Every structure is written in structure tokens, then in C-alpha cells.
């Protein structure tokens, strides 16, 4: 559904500013945590933040003076104004080294140039002929400022950054003025396009330094265009490099010229990329049709989709959005309360935390997101080629254009292959390059450099995050120990192309070695994309049943009922009321004895049952709602904002958002390519120029088709247009009486990407094709609910039993054990091996109540998640009761899990090797140097960690930065409707635990990685590809599945065997990441703490001895004494006490159902009721 049109007022402004700021005015302690800078280059990229890099009153959306038109017979000038917004980052080109580098890794520029040469992407050179450089020192001198005491950086409109790179702008010193940044006076010099001196020119000026250009009016005083070498090199790396890699265009200047032309000619719809675009040579699979023709069509689809993506990205760059640039004063993380929150990991005792430390703790959370996209083989960072599934056989009935023929694949390992022209002829200068065959390949430094667009600043920022990815701790391979690697390389004098002995700890190769457990690149196949995005709204439908019984579904047409009354009957409102009731009753919080525990179970049962009964009766009796039919229309939904300022925490997050946008736009364009190419003379010389507008219009027509939403924005111009007088020099004051017209008054602005996941799994209708039927059959086994006995600790009450085990069963500990152990107790109990003498009458009653509850819940459970809190249990129970009312059977539903990023101070020396700054004397000195870093933590020494929650709506309410898998399906509407609709399907990230330790491969579950923003940078407002992890995580998973009375001992032994001495540094968060169980993690941390208590110090030998002692403790010490019969427990007595009333048969005294269940229209009562024998 299209959004309502919006009217925005903007003021006329230049296309950019050069800020000259005193170095002392910069908050360098904060910039050091946000900037992207390489240690071997003074240029830097920093976020555009009001109060940090620009003044507090800076306006992010403007009407850029983009040129001039002649009007009237007298040849008067009218300025051409283009709506635009400023780029979310600023570019330091003078004294950028006043800010520390993002990473101390040496020679990153050398690494980028080496990878660029290997993969055939063009190197930087002066963008135009006869360029005259304007240095930062010269700018300072023109303003009368000391060059060595000031830093200069560019703030530029998003649509015109390529125009600045191509020297199509000039500095207007006459319009320079001062602003206040951080209480200091800073100068800013406006940048205007040279087109002011070339009326009616709506194209890129190829030779801006030619003062004799025929387009320049005779009476105009033409200025010197602005060219700065470090700035252009920076724009070449950060702006052009990622776009070139994403669009497979190896000539970066061609990308710049195309984007700059679109900035000046808003009506251009034809091709913007040149005809000499090259393509990667790789073997195409033999499918239907002629292979040669297929290769030509694949290459044409590749370049046309890239062209369309650049064209539509220009539309996004010229958009006017809702949010203004972030303001430093509005970041709660920097306020006093925010600092305590942000630094909670370090300030557990309530000690004050500096703003820099709080911000350092927060930005380290984002390391989990960046690492996920680096470690996931289906990440948008690696979508570097276009593949062809082959045209359908024309002899078959119904053969025609397909949405799925062309698609992007993750194939960075093919980038070094020879290159061809559009006809498939290999270029001579690349013919000697080896051709890599498709398949699995090792991930190398060059691939990471390519993913970063060969930009050393961006590479340094990504390394900043990878240095904070501590997931390598959980792999269980000794060869990834960074301390051992550095020590060994010092002894062996291992040669490295980037570092020497002194800089070996900080070397990028050291960081990648520590994280080398990343999966190999997957085979070339169609798969979902791993994308980055931002939740800009606190609203999402991520409850267990998604948007079931939503406001839109309940509202009747032409009904005047107040919206508030309708909202009260929705599923969302029912969940809110239930959670409020559970929280108000404090169920499970104050358990002090057996009676209190059993009362809590009864209270929970009654609360959930009453909520479900009230909800369903209201829908059926009052709303005449079709419960069962609506269930199959329910979806989990969320929206990712395309607002450029929402995800601009740092240059790396802006980069990830851009790569995601380019990947999505190309995915849409590729789906239409077959329809454009079908039956056309693709080999024709003018084919692209003729059909590129057709493809562009088709992609634009897909907006508001279910996936990418857009809205119409109407722009009005504020009074007063200030611009240079072209008849005077650039040092003269601007004129204030210009006339101006907006180039576009109303235009489409892209808003969001809508992501959804169907709640129900369906085997489909009879109209499915054979291939679709086979896919559904393969999925059915994964969704089939197994018919197995309920495991109490892994059931609905497992978390409560672990939490209150010491209170309820203080004698439930193994012989010789020091503390009650729920794993030992319930394992022996369910195996009928627990001595009956250890149990009292209260114990037995509680055990019977727990068993009945667990069995009753398991009989109706179709949510393939184990609750970890009372709120999760209440939500799952409510959803299961609703599913039972709808007569749902057989299959699990799709479930969501949110993995929230956290941060902590590191404890493992291997995690801090990259932060060692002093020279190492010898191999033995490596660990000492690492411990010195641990003992003296800095503001930026944090590492990322994770925590999971199944209450995803609360996670999404924090408006987080997110990473998730996304697949886009396309389909036509109803018969006779040719419009193409899409669905953004929630999918997975390939790599499993390599991506995040808490992720598992389960087709019934979808994960989202989230870094919260609310409370930090904004205020509160009203299937994988089958890759498996066979390291420590898989081993632990097997141990937990096998169970046993002392499962924590087996897990601890496995971890000790895999990690050795590093086990000493594991904290409760680390143990939780390994076992994904808060209470088991606490038991493992307690075992780890007992090691040092034995001999006064921790050692591997002492830990192994403790493990042997624990393994020697037998499950039962009673010899021949009678064991408690768990199977018979609960077979008699008050069975109805904990069974849901709707499940209790009438003969046992429950609520008697009516003779005919007309209320729910779901058949006769005997077919719905569970008998006592079934229970």
C-alpha cells in the first residue's frame, strides 16, 4: 500500500562545504571510536554528527544549487535547484591523522593495491586532465588560519559526491562563514557546481579546468575548480570502490561518471555505464538452450542490472527523508545514565564510566553484526557475480520469461579470473591469469579487501570490528590461538607482506588467523542474501503468531467503530494484556517452597487459559472472525528503513547499508531481465541504450509491490536563495536576489524493505509443480513434530526448575557434590535411578505437578522453542492454545529468535593481541604483552558477546541495527494482472555457529542479530546452505542432546580438551554462548572457579583432575535400595490440577464443553478432546 504524500520545505544550499576546524575543537576521544582511518594514510572518514563534525543547527535536507538556466529574451539566469540530503559521512583530507587510526594494522594501503591489481579493478589516478590541486594548507591560508592547527574535511550532498571527485565544483571563499562546533569557532567554505558558469548544461563537465570551454558565458569570471589529491583518492576508495565491486564494473571512473551525470540530469533514463564494461570469465553450467547465447544474455543481464541499480541509487541519494542527521547531545549513551548503562560490563560495582568508555562499549556491540556479514558466505559483501539458471525449453508448454533465471551469487574467488568483453572474447592483458574453477575455496586477505572496495580506511574500520569479534574462543582449535601464532611466527621468522616483527601482533593477517574458523566460500548457487538494515520504527509483528488477528483483519469495511475498540480485540493486544497480567502477578519470582511453586504453576495455567478463552470468544462471537482460515494468512513482519541517517553509526555501517541497497536493487532488476531480453536481438549494438529505460521502468513499477515501499514527497522552497554571482570572482560575497526553480517538485522516495515470515508451514495446494512439490516434501520432515517423550529440563518448566532447584530440592545433588544439581537430579529421576529415600512427600507432589504440566504442554506444543522466561512460556502457551482452537496438528510453526549484541571486557590474552603496541622481545614475551593490555583496559578495549531472546517484539522495540537472511520472491497478481509483486522472505545466514555461537541450523527457526539503538544513540519513542560446524559447538550440542546425570561435567571436559589453558578465561557470558543455557552456564562457571580453589592457582592439570573427580561421582549410591518410579508418578490423583481446563475431560470434573461446539465451528467435542489415556 502506498504511503500518503508528504510536503517538505527545504532551503537552497550549496552542494557541499569544506569545514576547517581547530584540532582542539574535535572530540578526538569520541571520533577515535567512530572514524575509519588506516594507520598508513592521514585521510579519514567520520560520521556526520551534529555537535561532533558539524554545528548543532546543521540541516540535513536541502535544495542543492545544481546549475543555471537562461530565461527570457534578455538571457536572465534562473538557478536550478535539486532536492537532496547530505551524505551521512564526512571526509577528512587535511590533518586527518589528528584522530588515531581505527586499527594499528600496518600497510593496509599496500594490501588494497595488491588486491586491486590481482582482481583487475582500476587504480586511482587524477580524475581529470590538467588538474590544479588545492591543498588543505592553501584553504587554511585563504582563511587566514594556521594549517598545522586545523583539520579540513568535506561535507557533501549525497547525490553530488561523484561530481566533487570529478572536479565539477569550486570553492566559493566569498560565502565562507563561521559556525560553532563543540564550543569552538570553525570555518566552512561552500562548494558550488561549475555549471553556474555554463547555463543550460545538464551533463557532467569532462574538462572542468578548461577555462575556455565554449559553454562558459563571456561575461562570467570562471573560478578554479576544486581538486584535492588526498580527498579524491579517499572518494575513489570509499565511494567508488564498494559501488564498483557491487556492480562488477572494474573501471571505477566509469562508475563515477555515470553517477555524476545522473546528479545533473534528473531526466536521464538510458544507460549510464559505458559499452566497454568487462566481465569475469567463468564456466557456465550447461542448462537448457544454447550455451553461447546464454553467456551473452548473462553478461547483458549483469551490466543492465548494474546500470539500473546505479540509476535507482541516484534516486535514493536525491531523496528527502524523515530523519535529520544524528546529534551528539541526543545520544543517551553519552549522558550520565547512558554512560552507566553502556559501560555496565565494566562498572558492575557502580563505578562511573567515561563517555569514551561508554561509547567504546556500545560500538563494540556492532562488531557482532559486522562479523556476521564477514563470516556469512551468503553476505551481500560477497555477491560479486551474476549467474544464469538457463532459459526454459521453448518446446515445453508455458515456457516464457522467468523471474528466477538470473541471480546474484557469492563468488569472490572468481574475481581473479580472466576478463572478457560482452561477446565473451578474453581480453589480452588478462589472458595469462589463471581461471579458478567453481567450488569451495579458502577465504584470504584479498577477498576481505575486495569486500571493502579496496578502501584502506574502510578495511581498517572493518578490522576494528573483527578485532572485537571474540567468537574464536568457542571454536576449539589450538591453531587459532593468536598468542601462539604470534609467538611461533617470531621464532620461525615467518615472512609477511604487510608487517615485520615489531608490528606482527597488530597485523591484519594475525586478526584473520584468529578468526580463520570462518566457513569456506560456498558453491555457486542461488541462496538468500545476508543483509544489513535498521529498524527505524518501534512497531513490528514479531510475536509467536505474528500479525494473526491484526487490526486490518478485524476491521470491517465501512464500519465506524473506533480504532481503539478494534485494537483491544487483536492478538497483539491479547499478548500485551497477558504479559502485563503475568508481570503483575510476579509468577515464578517469589518461590520459597513447594506449595509456592505449585501455586505459581496453577496461577500461570489459569492466567493463560483465561486470556486464550477471552480472546477466542471475542473473535468468534463479536467479530465473526474465521480463526482457522486467518491462521494461514498470518506472518511475522518487520520493516528495515532506507533512511540514510538511521543506520549511520560509523562509516562501516553506512557502507553495509549501501551494499545491501545495491544488492536488493540488482535482485529486483535481474528478475526483470529475462522478460526484457526474451525474444530480442541481444547482440545488437544499440540494444542496451534502447532497452535500458524499459528495464528501469519495470523496476520502478515494482515499488510498493510488497517488498520495497515508497512514498511521494512534495518539496517546497524556503524564501531566500543565496549563491555566487557568476560575473564576479569566487572571493566576492554571494548574491541574495537569485531566482530559482526546483528541478523536481514531487518525486518518489524509497522508504523501507518489508521482511516477513509465514507463521504456518503448509504442504501447499494441488497446483504445485513437481519441483515445488519435491521441495515441500523435503521441508515437511523438518517441520514434522516428533512423537517423543517429554524431557522435563528441556521442556516448558526447565528454566524454572533450574532456577529454583536449590530451594525445592536441596538434597538433589550427586554424592560428594557441593551444591544441588538439577541436571543430575532430573536425569536420574526420569531414568528411575533416583533413590526414593531422597524424596519427601512435598517433593513427590511437586514432581507429579511438573510432570503433568510438562506432558500436558507437550501434547499441544507446536512451537519449536524452549522457553527461558515466564513471559516466553506464557506467550508460547497462549499460542499453542489458539492453535488447538484452530485444530492445528502435525507441523511445527515457524519461530523467531533475536540475538542481541552485548559487550564485555576481554579476559583471554588471545583476544587482545591486536592491541599490543610495544615491541616484543621474544616469543615468550607475547603472552606477557597481552596480559599487560588486559590489566590496563582502555576506552576501546571491548569485545562483542551475545544473548538470545524469543520475545522478539521487545528486541525490535529497541529500533536496532540488524543483520538477517533475506530472499526475495516475485510473482504476478491475480489472473489478468501483469503487475509483479514481491515478498521479502525471512531466511538464514549461511555459516551457522561461524556467524554467531548462538545460531543453530533449524528450518523451523529464523534468527535476527540485533544491536539496540534505543537508550544508546536514540531515545525511546511512544535456511542456510547446509554448512555445519564440526568444532567445539557441534561437540557440545551432541553432549547436551545425549544428556546424562552430570552433563555439565562432560561439557566442561570437552571445552577443556578443546581450549586448554584458555578455559581459565571463560566467563558466564562465554559459557552461555557455548551451551545457550543460563543455568547450565552458571554451573560450568562454578566448576571453572573450583579449579583455582584446589591448589590456589588455575592450571590445565588441576582442571583435568577435578573433571576426573566429578566423573567418579556415580549417579546413585544406594546399592540395591528402591528407586523412585518416575513413570508411575502422576498416574493418579489430581490430574486435572495442572492440565489446561480446555483439555480436561468431563468425567474428571473439568469445565464441561457444550453439546455442540457451534461457537468455534470446528466439529464435535469428542474429536477435539484429549482423554486421560492420551495424556
UniProtKB/Swiss-Prot annotation:
Question: Where mainly located?
Answer: host cell
The role this protein plays is: Plays several crucial roles in viral infection. Participates in the opening of the viral DNA origin to initiate replication by interacting with the origin-binding protein. May disrupt loops, hairpins and other secondary structures present on ssDNA to reduce and eliminate pausing of viral DNA polymerase at specific sites during elongation. Promotes viral DNA recombination by performing strand-transfer, characterized by the ability to transfer a DNA strand from a linear duplex to a complementary single-stranded DNA circle. Can also catalyze the renaturation of complementary single strands.
Lineage of the species this protein comes from: Viruses, Duplodnaviria, Heunggongvirae, Peploviricota, Herviviricetes
Where in or outside the cell it occurs: the entry states: Host nucleus
Q: Which GO terms describe its cellular component?
A: host cell nucleus
Gene name of the record: DBP
Listed under GO biological process in this entry are: DNA replication
Q: Name one Pfam family in it.
A: Viral_DNA_bp
Zinc finger residue extent: unnamed: 496-509
State a single Gene Ontology molecular function: single-stranded DNA binding
Q: Which domain of life is it from?
A: Viruses
Family membership: Belongs to the herpesviridae major DNA-binding protein family.
InterPro entries noted in UniProt: DBP_sf, Viral_ssDBP_head, Viral_ssDNA-bd
Give the UniProt keywords, A-Z: DNA replication, DNA-binding, Host nucleus, Metal-binding, Zinc, Zinc-finger
Where are the annotated segments for Required for nuclear localization?
A: 1151-1175
Q: What is this protein called?
A: Major DNA-binding protein
SUPFAM superfamilies named among the record's database cross-references: Viral ssDNA binding protein
Kindly state the positions of the motif Required for filament formation in this protein.
Answer: 825-826
Fill in the subunit field for this protein: Homooligomers. Forms double-helical filaments necessary for the formation of replication compartments within the host nucleus. Interacts with the origin-binding protein. Interacts with the helicase primase complex; this interaction stimulates primer synthesis activity of the helicase-primase complex. Interacts with the DNA polymerase. Interacts with the alkaline exonuclease; this interaction increases its nuclease processivity.
Amino acid at each position: 500500500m502506498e504511503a500518503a504524500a508528504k510536503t517538505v520545505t527545504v532551503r537552497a544550499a550549496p552542494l557541499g562545504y569544506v569545514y576547517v576546524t581547530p584540532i582542539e575543537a574535535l572530540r578526538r576521544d569520541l571520533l577515535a571510536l567512530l572514524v575509519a582511518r588506516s594507520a598508513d594514510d592521514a585521510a579519514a572518514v567520520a560520521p556526520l554528527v551534529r555537535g561532533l563534525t558539524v554545528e548543532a543547527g546543521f540541516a540535513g535536507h536541502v535544495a542543492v544549487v545544481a546549475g543555471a538556466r537562461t530565461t527570457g529574451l534578455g538571457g536572465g539566469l534562473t538557478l536550478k535547484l535539486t532536492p537532496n540530503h547530505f551524505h551521512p559521512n564526512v571526509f577528512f583530507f587535511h590533518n586527518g591523522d589528528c584522530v588515531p587510526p581505527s586499527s594499528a594494522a600496518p600497510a593496509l594501503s599496500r594490501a588494497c593495491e595488491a588486491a586491486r591489481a590481482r582482481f583487475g579493478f582500476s587504480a586511482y589516478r587524477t580524475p581529470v586532465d590538467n588538474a590544479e590541486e588545492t591543498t588543505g594548507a592553501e584553504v587554511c591560508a585563504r582563511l587566514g588560519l594556521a594549517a598545522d592547527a586545523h583539520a579540513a574535511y568535506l561535507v557533501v550532498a549525497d547525490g553530488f559526491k561523484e561530481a566533487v571527485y570529478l572536479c565539477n565544483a569550486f570553492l566559493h571563499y566569498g560565502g565562507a562563514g563561521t559556525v560553532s562546533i563543540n564550543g569552538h569557532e570553525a570555518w566552512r567554505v561552500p562548494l558550488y557546481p561549475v555549471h553556474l558558469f555554463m547555463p543550460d548544461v545538464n551533463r557532467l563537465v569532462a574538462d572542468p579546468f578548461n577555462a575556455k570551454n565554449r559553454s562558459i558565458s563571456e561575461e562570467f569570471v570562471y573560478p578554479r575548480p576544486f581538486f584535492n589529491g588526498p580527498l579524491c583518492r579517499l572518494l575513489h576508495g570509499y565511494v567508488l570502490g564498494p559501488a564498483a565491486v557491487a556492480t562488477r564494473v572494474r573501471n571505477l571512473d566509469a562508475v563515477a561518471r555515470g553517477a555524476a551525470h545522473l546528479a545533473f540530469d534528473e531526466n536521464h533514463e538510458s544507460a549510464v555505464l559505458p559499452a566497454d564494461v568487462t566481465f569475469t570469465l567463468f564456466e557456465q553450467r550447461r542448462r537448457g538452450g544454447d550455451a553461447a547465447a546464454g553467456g551473452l544474455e548473462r553478461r547483458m543481464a549483469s551490466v543492465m542490472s548494474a546500470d539500473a541499480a546505479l540509476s535507482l541509487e541516484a534516486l535514493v541519494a536525491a531523496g528527502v527523508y524523515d530523519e535529520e542527521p544524528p546529534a551528539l547531545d541526543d545520544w543517551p549513551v553519552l549522558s550520565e545514565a547512558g554512560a552507566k548503562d553502556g559501560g555496565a560490563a565494566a562498572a558492575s560495582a557502580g563505578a562511573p564510566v567515561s563517555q569514551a568508555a561508554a561509547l567504546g562499549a556500545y560500538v563494540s556491540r556492532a562488531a557482532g553484526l559486522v562479523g556476521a556479514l564477514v563470516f556469512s558466505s551468503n553476505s551481500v559483501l560477497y555477491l560479486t557475480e551474476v549467474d544464469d539458471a538457463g532459459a526454459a525449453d521453448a518446446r515445453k508448454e508455458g515456457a516464457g520469461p522467468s523471474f528466477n533465471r538470473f541471480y546474484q551469487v557469492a563468488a569472490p574467488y572468481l574475481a581473479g579470473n580472466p576478463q572478457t568483453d560482452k561477446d565473451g572474447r578474453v581480453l589480452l592483458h588478462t589472458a595469462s591469469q589463471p581461471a579458478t574453477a567453481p567450488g569451495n575455496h579458502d577465504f584470504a586477505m584479498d577477498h576481505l579487501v575486495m569486500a571493502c572496495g579496496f578502501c584502506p580506511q574502510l578495511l581498517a574500520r572493518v578490522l576494528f570490528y573483527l578485532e572485537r569479534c571474540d567468537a574464536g574462543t568457542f571454536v576449539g582449535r589450538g591453531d587459532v590461538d593468536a598468542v601462539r601464532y604470534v609467538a611461533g611466527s617470531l621464532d620461525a621468522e615467518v615472512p609477511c607482506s604487510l608487517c615485520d616483527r615489531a608490528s606482527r601482533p597488530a597485523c591484519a593477517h594475525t586478526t584473520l588467523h584468529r578468526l580463520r574458523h570462518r566457513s569456506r566460500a560456498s558453491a555457486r548457487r542461488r541462496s538468500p542474501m545476508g543483509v544489513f538494515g535498521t529498524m527505524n520504527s518501534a512497531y513490528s509483528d514479531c510475536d509467536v503468531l505474528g500479525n494473526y488477528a491484526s487490526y486490518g483483519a478485524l476491521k470491517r469495511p465501512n464500519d465506524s467503530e473506533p480504532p481503539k475498540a478494534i485494537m483491544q480485540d487483536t492478538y497483539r493486544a491479547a499478548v500485551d494484556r497477558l504479559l502485563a497480567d503475568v508481570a503483575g502477578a510476579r509468577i515464578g519470582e517469589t518461590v520459597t517452597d513447594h506449595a509456592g511453586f505449585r501455586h505459581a504453576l496453577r496461577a500461570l495455567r489459569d492466567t493463560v487459559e483465561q486470556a486464550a478463552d477471552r480472546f477466542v470468544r471475542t473473535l468468534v462471537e463479536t467479530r465473526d472472525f474465521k480463526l482457522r482460515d486467518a491462521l494461514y494468512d498470518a506472518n511475522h513482519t518487520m520493516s528495515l528503513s532506507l533512511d540514510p541517517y538511521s543506520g549511520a553509526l560509523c562509516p562501516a555501517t553506512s557502507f553495509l547499508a549501501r551494499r545491501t541497497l545495491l544488492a536488493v536493487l540488482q535482485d529486483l532488476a535481474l528478475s526483470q531481465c529475462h522478460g526484457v531480453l526474451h525474444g530480442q536481438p541481444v547482440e545488437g549494438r544499440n540494444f542496451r541504450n534502447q532497452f535500458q529505460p524499459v528495464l528501469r521502468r519495470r523496476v520502478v513499477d515494482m515499488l510498493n509491490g510488497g517488498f520495497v515501499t515508497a512514498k511521494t514527497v512534495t518539496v517546497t522552497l524556503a524564501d531566500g536563495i543565496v549563491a555566487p554571482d557568476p560575473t564576479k570572482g569566487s572571493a566576492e560575497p554571494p548574491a541574495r536576489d537569485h531566482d530559482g526553480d526546483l528541478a523536481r517538485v514531487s518525486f518518489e522516495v524509497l522508504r523501507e524493505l518489508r521482511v516477513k515470515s509465514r507463521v504456518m508451514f503448509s504442504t501447499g495446494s494441488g497446483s504445485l509443480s513437481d519441483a515445488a512439490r519435491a521441495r515441500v516434501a523435503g521441508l515437511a520432515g523438518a517441520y514434522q513434530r516428533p512423537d517423543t517423550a517429554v524431557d522435563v529440563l528441556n521442556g516448558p518448566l526447565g528454566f524454572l526448575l533450574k532456577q529454583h532447584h536449590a530451594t525445592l530440592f536441596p538434597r538433589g545433588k550427586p554424592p560428594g557434590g557441593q551444591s544441588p544439581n538439577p541436571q543430575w537430579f532430573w536425569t536420574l529421576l526420569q531414568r528411575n535411578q533416583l533413590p526414593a529415600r531422597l524424596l519427601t512427600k512435598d517433593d513427590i507432589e511437586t514432581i507429579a505437578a511438573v510432570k503433568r504440566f510438562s506432558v500436558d504442554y507437550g501434547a499441544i506444543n507446536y512451537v519449536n522453542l524452549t522457553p527461558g522466561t515466564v513471559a516466553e512460556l506464557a506467550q508460547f502457551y497462549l499460542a499453542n492454545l489458539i492453535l488447538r482452537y484452530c485444530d492445528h496438528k502435525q507441523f511445527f510453526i515457524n519461530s523467531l529468535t533475536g540475538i542481541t549484541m552485548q559487550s564485555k571486557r576481554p579476559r583471554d590474552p588471545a583476544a587482545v593481541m591486536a592491541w599490543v603496541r610495544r615491541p616484543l622481545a621474544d616469543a615468550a614475551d607475547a603472552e606477557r604483552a597481552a596480559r599487560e593490555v588486559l590489566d590496563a583496559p582502555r576506552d576501546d578495549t571491548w569485545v562483542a558477546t551475545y544473548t538470545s531472546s524469543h520475545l522478539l517484539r521487545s528486541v525490535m522495540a529497541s529500533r536496532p541495527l540488524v543483520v538477517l537472511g533475506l530472499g526475495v520472491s516475485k510473482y504476478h497478481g491475480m489472473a489478468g494482472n501483469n503487475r509483479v509483486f514481491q515478498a521479502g522472505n525471512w531466511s538464514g545466514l549461511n555459516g551457522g555457529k561461524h556467524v554467531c555461537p548462538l545460531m543453530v541450523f533449524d528450518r523451523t527457526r529464523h534468527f535476527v542479530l540485533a544491536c539496540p539503538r534505543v537508550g544508546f544513540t536514540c531515545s525511546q519513542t511512544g535456511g542456510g546452505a547446509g554448512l555445519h560446524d564440526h568444532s567445539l559447538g557441534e561437540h557440545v550440542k551432541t553432549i547436551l542432546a545425549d544428556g546424562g546425570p552430570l552433563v555439565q561435567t562432560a561439557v566442561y571436559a570437552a571445552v577443556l580438551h578443546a581450549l586448554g589453558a584458555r578455559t581459565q578465561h571463560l566467563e558466564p557470558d562465554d559459557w552461555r554462548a557455548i551451551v545457550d543455557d543460563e543455568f547450565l552456564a552458571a554451573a560450568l562457571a562454578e566448576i571453572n572457579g573450583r579449579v583455582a580453589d584446589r591448589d590456589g592457582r588455575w592450571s590445565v592439570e588441576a582442571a583435568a583432575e577435578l573433571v576426573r573427580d566429578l566423573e567418579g561421582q556415580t549417579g546413585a549410591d544406594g546399592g540395591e535400595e528402591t528407586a523412585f518410579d518416575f513413570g508411575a508418578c502422576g498416574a493418579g490423583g489430581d490430574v486435572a490440577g495442572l492440565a489446561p481446563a480446555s483439555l480436561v475431560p468431563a468425567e474428571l470434573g473439568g469445565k464441561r464443553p457444550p453439546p455442540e461446539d457451534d461457537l468455534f465451528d470446528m466439529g464435535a467435542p469428542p474429536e477435539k478432546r484429549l482423554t486421560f489415556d492420551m495424556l
